[in-house]
Amino acid sequence: MEKLTDLNYTLSVITLMNNTLHTILEDPGMAYFPYIASVLTVLFALHKASIPTMKIALKTSKCSYKVVKYCIVTIFNTLLKLAGYKEQITTKDEIEKQMDRVVKEMRRQLEMIDKLTTREIEQVELLKRIYDKLTVQTTGEIDMTKEINQKNVRTLEEWESGKNPYEPREVTAAM
């Protein structure tokens, strides 16, 4: 690990890359040299930047796995951005956070739907009571005795002797 952060080693790797690129460049059919050179430069820079960072992170952090995972994800996301991709790699922690946020929002919406449903049910019950009060209720026979002030009127069947007491009778007078 000491060798990776050594300046002489870095210079020898750069020299090796340059020699390799010059041998590739001598081939006249090599048209993609600038692209290969830029990719190799980026990879080497990431390699040189990530090794000391990872060493320090592993020594100082207690949760080294999370730090290493975060560094690797960050490196890959940087490479994807350099390649022109808009997608990014996410870790399980980020996915779990997003899922928790989605679940929380769904619970909030379900509570809102429950409240609205309860209100709608109450409104329907109120409208039913109002409708029941406004509907005309039919009864078999209407008692009109209170309206025409004839409470003591009897029918033919209700009279005791079976005769109408209001019919005129023959009256004989004694002299």
UniProtKB/Swiss-Prot annotation:
<feature type="binding site">
    <location>
        <position position="120"/>
    </location>
    <ligand>
        <name>Ca(2+)</name>
    </ligand>
</feature>
<feature type="topological domain" description="Lumenal">
    <location>
        <begin position="1"/>
        <end position="28"/>
    </location>
</feature>
<dbReference type="Pfam" id="PF01452">
    <property type="entry name" value="Rota_NSP4"/>
</dbReference>
<keyword id="KW-0813">Transport</keyword>
<comment type="similarity">
    <text>Belongs to the rotavirus NSP4 family.</text>
</comment>
<keyword id="KW-0735">Signal-anchor</keyword>
<dbReference type="GO" id="GO:0044155">
    <property type="term" value="C:host caveola"/>
</dbReference>
<dbReference type="GO" id="GO:0015267">
    <property type="term" value="F:channel activity"/>
</dbReference>
<comment type="function">
    <text>Plays an essential role in the virus replication cycle by acting as a viroporin. Creates a pore in the host endoplasmic reticulum and as a consequence releases Ca(2+) in the cytoplasm of infected cell. In turn, high levels of cytoplasmic calcium trigger membrane trafficking and transport of viral ER-associated proteins to viroplasms, sites of viral genome replication and immature particle assembly.</text>
</comment>
<keyword id="KW-0260">Enterotoxin</keyword>
<keyword id="KW-0945">Host-virus interaction</keyword>
<dbReference type="GO" id="GO:0046872">
    <property type="term" value="F:metal ion binding"/>
</dbReference>
<dbReference type="GO" id="GO:0044169">
    <property type="term" value="C:host cell rough endoplasmic reticulum membrane"/>
</dbReference>
<feature type="binding site">
    <location>
        <position position="123"/>
    </location>
    <ligand>
        <name>Ca(2+)</name>
    </ligand>
</feature>
<keyword id="KW-0407">Ion channel</keyword>
<feature type="glycosylation site" description="N-linked (GlcNAc...) asparagine; by host">
    <location>
        <position position="8"/>
    </location>
</feature>
<keyword id="KW-0325">Glycoprotein</keyword>
<keyword id="KW-0479">Metal-binding</keyword>
<keyword id="KW-0472">Membrane</keyword>
<keyword id="KW-1072">Activation of host autophagy by virus</keyword>
<dbReference type="GO" id="GO:0046762">
    <property type="term" value="P:viral budding from endoplasmic reticulum membrane"/>
</dbReference>
<keyword id="KW-0812">Transmembrane</keyword>
<dbReference type="GO" id="GO:0034220">
    <property type="term" value="P:monoatomic ion transmembrane transport"/>
</dbReference>
<keyword id="KW-0406">Ion transport</keyword>
<keyword id="KW-0106">Calcium</keyword>
<feature type="topological domain" description="Cytoplasmic">
    <location>
        <begin position="52"/>
        <end position="175"/>
    </location>
</feature>
<keyword id="KW-0843">Virulence</keyword>
<feature type="transmembrane region" description="Helical; Signal-anchor for type III membrane protein">
    <location>
        <begin position="29"/>
        <end position="51"/>
    </location>
</feature>
<dbReference type="GO" id="GO:0016020">
    <property type="term" value="C:membrane"/>
</dbReference>
<feature type="glycosylation site" description="N-linked (GlcNAc...) asparagine; by host">
    <location>
        <position position="18"/>
    </location>
</feature>
<comment type="function">
    <text>The secreted form acts as an enterotoxin that causes phospholipase C-dependent elevation of the intracellular calcium concentration in host intestinal mucosa cells. Increased concentration of intracellular calcium disrupts the cytoskeleton and the tight junctions, raising the paracellular permeability. Potentiates chloride ion secretion through a calcium ion-dependent signaling pathway, inducing age-dependent diarrhea.</text>
</comment>
<keyword id="KW-0800">Toxin</keyword>
<dbReference type="InterPro" id="IPR002107">
    <property type="entry name" value="Rotavirus_NSP4"/>
</dbReference>
<dbReference type="GO" id="GO:0090729">
    <property type="term" value="F:toxin activity"/>
</dbReference>
<dbReference type="GO" id="GO:0039520">
    <property type="term" value="P:symbiont-mediated activation of host autophagy"/>
</dbReference>
<comment type="subunit">
    <text>Homotetramer. Interacts with the immature particle in the viroplasm. Interacts with host CAV1, early and late in infection. Interacts with host integrin ITGA1/ITGB1 heterodimer. Interacts with host integrin ITGA2/ITGB1 heterodimer. Interaction with microtubules blocks trafficking to the Golgi apparatus.</text>
</comment>
<dbReference type="GO" id="GO:0005576">
    <property type="term" value="C:extracellular region"/>
</dbReference>
<keyword id="KW-0964">Secreted</keyword>
<keyword id="KW-1043">Host membrane</keyword>
<keyword id="KW-1182">Viral ion channel</keyword>
<keyword id="KW-1038">Host endoplasmic reticulum</keyword>
<protein>
    <recommendedName>
        <fullName>Non-structural glycoprotein 4</fullName>
    </recommendedName>
</protein>
